[in-house]
C-alpha cells in the first residue's frame, strides 16, 4: 500500500515543484532587477529657458552634438529592428524600456509596485505624461543631462540660457553604469551579468594604469564650441560606436597569421596559427548582449574558389537558457589577452592555385536566431548581423612565408606593445 501511495504522490509533488518554479522562481527576463533600473528615471520637467526636452530643441544650439547623436545606436535604441523583435519575443515586458527609453516621460505606464520582484506581476497604471513621439528618441539628451529642471554636464563654467550645474560624474564612467551593468537574477548563473560590460571593465588594466573611462573610446575627445557662438573647448563626440560598428570592432582587436614552415613542399604537413588579440578594448571582446560571438575560420580553396578543407572555431558565451539560466563557459578575451587558433593541412602533390583563407567574423546573433526573429517576431530591415573583422588569403606555395611576413610586418608594433592600440591612441584605426 505504501508503495502505491508513493507512486501516486510522486507526480503530484513533481507538478507542485514545477508550478512553484515557473510561477515563483523562473525569471521572465534574462537579468535581475537592480534597484536603480527597476523603475524609469522619474518625470523630468522642461528647464527654464527651453521649450522642450526633445533632442531637436537641444540641437538648435548644440548642433554638432545633435547631428552625432542622430547617427548613434542610442538614438535608435527603441526603434532598432533587433530590439523590437527581441522585445516582442519577450512579450513586450515593460522593464526593457527602462534602458531603451529610460525617462518616465517616454513610457506609457507607471510602475507602482513589483510584488516579490516579479516583473510580470508589476502593478501598472497609465502615465499622464507619456509622449509617444519622445519615446522614439530612446536614449536622448535629457536621459543623461536633465534632472529636476537643471541641465547637468562636465563643465564648471557656463553662460547657457538655461540652468546648468557641474556634475563630476561626467568625467567618470558612472553615467554608463545604469544600463551597461545588467546583473544576474534568481535562478540565473552567469559568470558576469548578461550585459555586464561595466563589470568587465571596472578595475581592469585600462582604468587602473591608463586612466581610461568608457568615454575614452566611445566618446572621443574633440576641440570645438560646445554650443553655437560659444568658445572653443575640449569636449566629447556623442557617437557611442560599439559592437554594431565594424570599424570599432576592428580597432579593438589585432590579428596575426603565421605558418610553421618557411618553405613548405608537396607532402609537407603545414600548421598555421592565427593569433587574436584584444589589443584595444578595456572590457572583454565580444561584450554586451550574450548572443554576440566571433568565429575564426580557416579554409583551403582551389583556383576555382571551391573549398577543399575548412575549420571554424567560436569565441563567445555558451548559456543554457532552460530550465534555469546557466552559463556553461565563457571563452571571450580579457583586455590585452590573446588566443591562438591552429589549422593543419598536408600539401598535395599539385599546389598550384591553392590558397589558404583566414577570416575572423563578428556575429550579433546566429543565423538560426536571425531566421527565428524574422519568421516569428517580425524582424524587419536588412541591418547586417555579422561582418568580417579580418580576412586575408595566402598562396600555398613556397611564397607563403614571404606573404605572411609582409602581412605580419603591419602588426609588429601591435604584437610588441598591444596596450598602445587603445582607441585613445589609435583613433583613426
Where are these regions (language model features)?
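Short, conserved sequence motifs used for protein processing/export or organelle targeting and
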Residues: 210-216, 220-415, 423
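Sequence context of c-type cytochrome heme-c attachment sites
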Residues: 11-171, 175-178, 184-208
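Acidic/polar hotspots within intrinsically disordered regions
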Residues: 426-428
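N-terminal Sec-pathway targeting helices
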Residues: 1-13
